[in-house]
Every structure is written in structure tokens, then in C-alpha cells.
Amino acid sequence: MKSIRLLLLLASGVTTGAFAQSGGLTDMSQSRFAKMANTELGAVHWTDGFWGDRFNVYSHTSLQSMWDTWNNPDVSHGFRNFEIAAGVCEGEHWGPPFHDGDMYKWMEGVASVYAVTKDPELDKLMDHFIEHVVKAQRADGYIHTPVIIEEKNKGIDTHSDKQQQTVIGTKVGGEDEKGAFANRLNFETYNLGHLMMAGIIHRRATGKTTLFDAAVKATDFLCHFYETASAELARNAICPSHYMGVVEMYRATGNPRYLELSKNLIDIRGMVENGTDDNQDRIPFRQQYNAMGHAVRSNYLYAGVTDVYAETGEDQLMKNLTSIWKDIVTRKMYVTGACGALYDGTSPDGTCYEPDSIQKVHQSYGRPYQLPNSTAHNETCANIGNMLFNWRMLEVTGDAKYADIVETALYNSVLSGVSLDGKKYFYTNPLRISADLPYTLRWPKERTEYISCFCCPPNTLRTVCQAQNYAYTVTPNAVYCNLYGANTLATTLKETGKIGLVQETEYPWEGAVKLTVTEAPKPSKKKAFSLFLRVPDWCEKATLKVNGEPVQGTWKANTYAEVNRIWKKGDCVEWVMDMPVKLLEANPLAEEIRNQVVVKRGPLVYCLESMDIEGGHKIDNVLIPADIRLTPKKITIEGSPIVALDGTARLVDEVSWKDTLYREVGKADKPVHIRLIPYYAWGNRGKAEMTVWMPLARANH
């Protein structure tokens, strides 16, 4: 036992320093104010189990079906727009202006798969797409297919070095509003930000610079634009993926101009006249302490500002970010990790009557504790944005509580956006579906192969195909296990050397994790390093063994357990987390879910679908006893192995509510067998009602 030192680590105790790693999803290896860094692309491979299954589905079925969609102009003009802009064929732009960025997200997903599989067919596919991007890009670095196509159709030579960057679209609100940055709803900076990230990931995965060079040109264009454009144009940007993109370009190139731009973007946001809460620019960012407005835009902004903090260490930014994070997690986030309660609303709402200050918001955060179920928007992109924000907060603080939110969102409100077979998609992720809802919501209740707003499918593709990169983080002499799953890790620690691990687990179905050292520092080094195991928020009890010897300790949720020793090949760590079924209740201020419960086991939130109620009873008539016993049961849905929960609930007397608003409380004394399935798996067995929150029937005493 002398060689084993066990610590309870409150993540704020992680040391800083430069890391050997470079080339992860976010390369904070040289970021002065980061506490940990990603492993390299390709360092982690799923081998089996839950994430092995999901990676296989997404990297094969989803990737290909999405390309088939992009490549079919009768369904989507996504790729055809690039062909027209590249001069391969003639035509007009068709589709949303943000489709360019959506294709870049798809491209980033393909590159992330290639980093693992090295499939030459994927390499060819990427080269084919990149060829069109490069041909479409203007000589000055600008690329946005609606504008490029407009210019080409007006006979403008977009490849001329003498071409001015503002030939079309220099006047906001003018007749030429289709031009560069003339209309904030053109999403140019959003598109360019995703081009930057796609170019970086492609280079890190393949070693090629074709798309990266295009991204450098685009970033240089953006720098020049912000240095020379009118204030009106410079402030005209929404959905700021470019904050993350510009900082990552700085990390990839070392160009200080890019870091300066990233800092200026925050300053410019505070100078907007007639700004909106929907776009998070009504007041300067440094005065914002609560999450507001469009949930995708806000979460992207918070992730990007965290990137800026990692490079600058500005205390005020961290004050804003930690306050906003607390507002989200303790007052505005769904139990599934989803964000964005409102389809449409006003801001502020319910706090004052000042007509001049009331604004419209959409796809937005609501008021504190405003968490409706049937009308929850919860766009998949917003939930991914929540992951991006929390992942960066993990890297800059080392605090395990951020990894917990990454896991919660990924398992529940991100995976729910795609069918189990990887072919159909949701745009929104409500927590309740009722056949009796007396109005029609904007988005369908069933997943479809193509959504007119096709931003979420490629975003989910890249996120799931990159999930292995969330499994571990590193410091110069430590490896942190953040996302459990059967995998292999091969990496190098700056102060220790090459490290290899094999992780075996049935997580999230079971809480047992086994880690075996497959490569350790050479005997001549005899240098100790630490292995940190994340203690999830839901974990109240865990046991730890090293080479079969029990290690005594008490571990608090949302921390790490540390094992520090001189490791050798063959060393084995067994980490077992108790995974009981839990009933959760909400803060009573959350009126829509008061006196209701949600079932959770491990990281998974469970739901009830109408076909899983014995006797075909209505879902609204099922109550969950406070003392219900739910038994795990292995089942299969759409070929995907799942652990369901079986138990006996109570049934309310079934009386029609037609033309009735209120009535006397009925009896709830009839037992009824129910089966709960993980929320991410709902909607895969045909049309059905569904609910996450269910009325609580308290035990009689």
C-alpha cells in the first residue's frame, strides 16, 4: 500500500503548465490559463460498448446519409451552392444562409472519424468537398455562397486580386443587402467560424493544409474587415461560432493578430446600438451575469469567451462566465442538460412594465425556473453549445462539475436529437409529447430525415464522432478520466512519457470501470504520475482497487479520486460506482414540474412512452409512487442494446377531460405495470406519447 497515494481532489487544485499534447479538439496545451488539455485527435479509440455502438452508427450510417442529403439538390442545395459558387455549374443560391456552416460542421465530423479510422474513402470525400470550397473562396479570403453566387451572376470576377472586399453589400438595409455582412441574418461569421474549426480539425486529422489554408485566408479577411469596416457593419454578427474559431486559429498558428481580434470581438459586442437580449448584445458582455436570449447564440458566445479567457486570464470574464454558468445550471437548464425553454417570448417578461425595454426573443432561455415540458424548445444545437461551454470551463478550471454537465447533455439531450439508426433527426427536444395538445408546434413530433433548418444533424454528427476526445484530459503528469466508455488511450505526458491505457466497462448501464496500463514510462525514468477518476454528480458510493488491493477513501460527487504511483505495464485499477435508480424532484419555483418526479439511473434520464403502459392506458393517468421499485432489464430497440426499467406505478381513474378544465381529484389506487426507457431512445418505435416528468404519488404513512 506504500506505493499508493489516494487523494480527494477538488478540481481547482489542478496545476497549470505547458503540456506535451497538441492537436486535440481544443488545443489548450500552451494556453497560459488552462489547467488541463485535450488528448490528441486519434489518441482514443472506442473499442466496444455504448460509445463503440454509437460511433459505428454515426460514422457509417449518419455520415453517409447526411452526405447523400447534401449532395441531392432536390432535397438540399447545401453542396450544390458550393458547386455554383465554385463555377462548376450555374444557378441561384437556394436554402438558408447558414447551410455553408452546416456543411463545415459535417466536414469536421468526417475529419474526426478519419482521425480514428484512417479510411481512404473518407479522405477522398473530404478532398472532393474541399476542392469546391477553395474554388468558391474569393481572392480576399471571403466565402459565403449566397454572396459569391450573387457576385458571379452579376459578372464580378471573385478571383481577381484587385477585387475589393466590399463590392456588394456595404450598406445595411440597402437594396444590396445580400452582400458581405450587410444583413446580420446572413450568418456569415457563424459560417466562417465553422470553416475555421473544420480546417483545423482536418489538418490535425490528415496533416493536409488545403482546408486549413482556406480557413487562414478567411480569418485574415475577418481581421481586415473588423479593422476597416464601419461600426454598423462590424457589429452586424449573430450566432458567434467565430469566437471559438478565431481563438483556435490563434492556437493553431500562433498569429497574435487572431488573439487580438478575439478580444476585440468582445469589446465590439458592448458597443452595439439598439442591441437585443436575443443576441446577447443589449448590454456589454462584461455586465452580463445571467444567461439570456437565443440559447444557441448564447452558449456559443459563452464557449468562445471561455476560449478568450484561457489565453488572456482576464478576471472579469471569468466572473461573468461563472455567474452565467450558475444561472443556467441552477435555474434554467433542463434535467436532460438541454437549454432554451421558449419557442418565442419576451425579455424581460413578468418583472416590469416598461414597453420600451420589452423585446422579442426566440428559441431562447426563459425566466429563472421557467421550464415547460410540451413546449420546451431545447434545440439540439443549444444543447451541444452547453457541452462546448462546459468542456472549456473544465479545461480552464479543472473542476469536475463541468464534466458532469458535458456528460448529462451528451447522453440525454444531444443523443435524443437523432434516431437510433442514425437516419432521422429532431430539431427540438421536448420533455413531453401529448396527442391532446390543442395547438400545433412549429416542429414535428417525430424525427424526419431532412429538416428545413438542417443545422442540428451535422452538429450532432461531429459531436458524437468526437465523443472519444471527451474521455480524457491531461496535465504534464496526470491523466483524467472524464467520460467513461470502453476504449484505448495512447498519449504522451510531458513530464512522464508515453502512456497507454485500456478501459473496459459497460457504462452507462453498469458502474464498474476497469483500467489496465498497457504502456508505462521506461524503468529508467521511474517517475510517478496520477490517474484521476471522475466521481459523477449522481454517485454517492464507490469502491477502488489497485492490482486487487482495496484502497480506502471517501469520494464526494463532482470531484476526482486520485491514484498516484509509479505505474508499470499490467497494473490494473478497478473503479466501481454504485448506480441506484433515483427519483428526482425539482425546485418548487419550477411551476410546470412541481409535485412531479423524473427517474434517473447513472447519467441517464428515463422517460415513459405510451406503448410501455400495460393495458394501453393514457400516459397522463400514470402516477409514480415515491417507493416504486424499478428493476433494470436488458432490451433492444432498433438493434441498439438498452437497459430499461420495469416497475409498478399507480393509475388514476380514467375519465375524459373533454370540455373540462377542473374537477375533483380521483382515486389512484390501481396498480399498472410500466417500462421506462432512456430519454435519448424515445420515438424509435413509432408515434407515441412521451413524458419525462410524471406526477408523484407519495407513500401512505
Region roles according to the model:
Residues 1-23:
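Bacterial Sec-dependent N-terminal signal peptides
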Residues 21-102, 127-169:
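Low-complexity, Ser/Thr/Pro/Gly-enriched N-terminal "stalk/linker" regions
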Residues 23, 86-103, 119, 156-158, ...:
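Solvent-exposed loop and edge beta-strand segments that line ligand/cofactor-binding
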Residues 23, 73, 262, 321, ...:
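C-terminal beta-rich recognition modules with glycine/proline-rich loops and embedded aromatic residues
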Residues 49-53, 57, 107-120, 193-208, ...:
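Well-ordered alpha-helical scaffold segments within catalytic/enzyme domains
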Residues 86-96, 114-240, 244-276:
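Extended ligand-binding groove/face enriched in aromatic
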Residues 310-331, 371-423:
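Catalytic-core region of carbohydrate-active enzymes that cleave or remodel glycosidic bonds
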Residues 539-564, 583-589:
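Solvent-exposed beta-strand/loop surfaces of large extracellular or lumenal domains
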